[in-house]
UniProtKB/Swiss-Prot annotation:
<dbReference type="InterPro" id="IPR032549">
    <property type="entry name" value="DUF4939"/>
</dbReference>
<feature type="region of interest" description="Disordered">
    <location>
        <begin position="258"/>
        <end position="364"/>
    </location>
</feature>
<feature type="region of interest" description="Disordered">
    <location>
        <begin position="67"/>
        <end position="88"/>
    </location>
</feature>
<dbReference type="GO" id="GO:0005739">
    <property type="term" value="C:mitochondrion"/>
</dbReference>
<comment type="subunit">
    <text>Interacts (via BH3 domain) with VDAC1. Interacts with pro-survival Bcl-2 family members, BCL2, BCL2L1 isoform Bcl-X(L), MCL1, BCL2A1 and BCL2L2. Interacts with BAX and BAK1.</text>
</comment>
<protein>
    <recommendedName>
        <fullName>Protein Bop</fullName>
    </recommendedName>
</protein>
<dbReference type="GO" id="GO:0097345">
    <property type="term" value="P:mitochondrial outer membrane permeabilization"/>
</dbReference>
<dbReference type="GO" id="GO:0051881">
    <property type="term" value="P:regulation of mitochondrial membrane potential"/>
</dbReference>
<keyword id="KW-0053">Apoptosis</keyword>
<comment type="function">
    <text>Could induce apoptosis in a BH3 domain-dependent manner. The direct interaction network of Bcl-2 family members may play a key role in modulation of RTL10/BOP activity.</text>
</comment>
<keyword id="KW-0496">Mitochondrion</keyword>
<feature type="compositionally biased region" description="Pro residues">
    <location>
        <begin position="311"/>
        <end position="322"/>
    </location>
</feature>
<dbReference type="Pfam" id="PF16297">
    <property type="entry name" value="DUF4939"/>
</dbReference>
């Protein structure tokens, strides 16, 4: 096989970084076997990742491939110091070196610095389950270098409150959003202050007393207008807060009693009934023409007559004096005698005209 084809099948020759790139770029790796030798990563961590997260494993593989390609050309290649070395379960990268003057919390506004940090973090978060547990301590160590807003975001992972996610891409994407956009951090982690709720769901009674007083005053006014009485002001007993603390039964009884007093008129004399209504045995109603005096009897209550002393009564012997008023008993006796004596018109005609004259006969 031609020598050029063998070179095309092998990997590219690593390009050593220039001095300015090595000084400006914080991503520097140290060879553990030969200290002091600095080199750039042989593979881009965002394009091609090693199998176990170890860069030594990748370099050993490349050296073995170079040896195989050299053997194809018939010229053995020199083996490096790491040729044939088994990859270790723990990565041998040194800790990430921050650029002087940069803030790990905001990364000093340098997106490339954040990308390199996430790249190193991704090397320790292996895709193989057998290396994942060994790399957790290194991941936490890298997260511990964060400060500011990013440190607050990584605190649950460092404290053990949240487990490290299995999906590393989402983990890095979330961290990148938090570091670059502080508003997203405030959205997910800010504590919104809220006032403490009241011990009771009901509002305090003291603040509602003026409203209750106005409502009761309007209620009493409307009720007084319906009852036809003059409206009265709110009682002082109901305006005090102590009245609201009593039971509702006593309040309603007090209100009803006051409304009853308002609707009841003042003391009046009992109505004077006619003498005919006072009789226990009602008689037949006679026409007004036959009994003109009894049709409209003079209502004289017995209480007024009994209150007058006997000395003030007029003397019946004097003809010029006023006619003495009859008592209620005399009126009843007179009415009874008249009812007995009254009869048909024929009986009235047959009655004797005088005490000494004989009765007149109508027959001729």
């Amino acid at each position: 096989m031609p020598r050029g084809q063998c070179r095309q099948q092998g990997p590219r020759i690593p390009i050593w970084a220039a001095a300015n790139y090595a000084n400006a770029h914080p991503w520097q790796q140290m060879d553990q076997t030969s200290p002091g030798v600095a080199y750039t990563p042989l593979v881009d961590p965002w394009i091609e990742r090693p199998c176990c997260g170890d860069t030594l494993c990748a370099r050993t593989t490349m050296e073995q491939k170079s040896t195989a390609s050299g053997a194809c050309g018939g010229k053995p290649a020199e083996r490096g110091p790491l040729t044939g070395r088994m990859p270790s379960s723990r990565p041998h990268r040194v800790d990430f070196c921050w650029v002087p003057g940069s803030d790990p919390g905001t990364f000093d506004g340098s997106p490339w610095l954040l990308d390199r940090f996430l790249a190193q973090l991704g090397d320790y978060m292996s895709f193989h389950f057998e290396h994942y547990q060994d790399n957790i301590s290194r991941v936490c160590e890298i997260l511990g270098r964060l400060t500011g807003q990013a440190r607050a975001w990584a605190a649950p992972y460092l404290d053990g409150d949240l487990p490290l996610p299995d999906d590393y891409e989402l983990f890095c994407q979330d961290l990148k959003e938090v570091v670059q956009d502080l508003n997203s951090f405030a959205e997910y982690h800010a504590v919104v202050p809220c006032p403490l709720p009241l011990a009771s769901s009901q509002l305090p009674v003291a603040s509602q007393l003026p409203v209750v007083k106005q409502y009761l005053a309007r209620f009493l006014k409307g009720l007084a207008l319906d009852m036809g009485t003059a409206p009265r002001s709110l009682p002082a007993a109901m305006a005090t807060p102590a009245a609201f603390g009593s039971n509702s039964i006593s309040r309603s009884a007090l209100l009803e009693q006051q409304l009853t007093k308002e609707s009841t008129p003042g003391p009046k004399e009992p109505p004077v009934l006619p003498s005919s209504a006072c009789s226990s045995k009602p008689g037949p109603v006679e026409p007004a023409s036959s009994q003109p005096e009894e049709a409209a009897p003079t209502p004289v209550p017995g209480l007024l007559e009994s209150a007058n002393p006997p000395a003030q009564r007029p003397d019946p012997a004097h003809p010029g004096g006023p006619k003495p008023q009859k008592t209620e008993e005399e009126v009843l006796e007179t009415e009874g005698d008249q009812e007995v004596s009254l009869g048909t018109p024929q009986e009235v005609v047959e009655a004797p005209e005088g005490p000494g004259e004989p009765p007149l006969s109508l027959g001729f």
